[in-house]
Each structure stands twice: as structure tokens, then as C-alpha cells.
Amino acid sequence: MTLERLNAYHIMWLFVFFDLPVTTKKERHDAMQFRKNLEKDGFLMMQFSVYVRHCGSYESMEVHIKRVKAFVPTAGLVSILSVTDKQYGNITTVPLKWTNRSLK
């Protein structure tokens, strides 16, 4: 068995974006359960409806995509985006102080 060297192109990140209805009590429960399931599976909240998870390999990413698909409630929209570690490293996060300046 050969060991493949880890690099920024084999390590993956998963983003889960969602817009779930929360009008009824059942919808609120389903949305909260979806979030809890994401967190139990190792996802971290990046923004309120955006969760992110590090995956050490492409195979690991595939496993977590299947899990997310199993968590999806019957209503709403859920999107999954996978990016390499190299691509993830190019994310630009704008500090709050900069966004506040643009509002003045």
C-alpha cells in the first residue's frame, strides 16, 4: 500500500449553504435538527446559514456529503460546495470594521 502525500489539492473543505422555512413549529424543529446534525458531523457555523467542514481526503468528503444529504429536511434549499485546501486558503474575509465604514 502506498501512502499519498497530503497536499493542498487533496485536502478538501465542504460548505453547506441552506435556506430552510421556519414558519411552523415543525419547520423550526426540522431546521434546528438539521443544524444540530451538521454540528454533530463536525461542521462549524461560518455564518448563520453557512456551515464549513475540513475533510482530510476526497473519500472523507464523499462520506460527509452523503451524511448531509441524509440530514436534509423535506422543505427548503440546501447546497453543498466542495473546494480544495488551496482554494479555501484564498478566501478573503472582510473585517467588520471595513464593512461598517462602507455604511457611513
Model regions and ranges:
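Basic nucleic-acid-binding interfaces
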Residues: 2-15, 20-104
